Amino acid sequence: MPKIIEAIYENGVFKPLQKVDLKEGEKAKIVLESISDKTFGILKASETEIKKVLEEIDDFWGVC
């Protein structure tokens, strides 16, 4: 059964933000979804505008 978890990408490695029930060496598929993809349609802004705002937030706070 598929399970969705959040991970952060650091130094070329995806690091899960919660415990993952996998055996050492076991393979898993990763589906990448950006924050702008997740929020598209919620805000009344174009995808380009959302990406620009997220880039500005990341530049200032380093959180995206």
UniProtKB/Swiss-Prot annotation:
Could you name the domain of life of the organism this protein comes from? Archaea
* Key words, A-Z: Toxin-antitoxin system
Q: Which InterPro entries match?
A: AF2212-like, AF2212-like_dom_sf
**Any Pfam family:** AF2212-like
Has keyword ATP-binding? no
Which parts form a coiled-coil structure per UniProt? none
Record has Disulfide bond as a keyword: no
User: Could you tell me what this protein does?
Assistant: Possibly the antitoxin component of a type II toxin-antitoxin (TA) system. Its cognate toxin is VapC4 (Potential).
What family does this chain come from, according to its entry? Belongs to the UPF0165 family.
Query: Which protein are we looking at?
Result: Putative antitoxin VapB4
**In which organism is this protein found?**
Archaeoglobus fulgidus (strain ATCC 49558 / DSM 4304 / JCM 9628 / NBRC 100126 / VC-16)
The protein's gene is named: vapB4
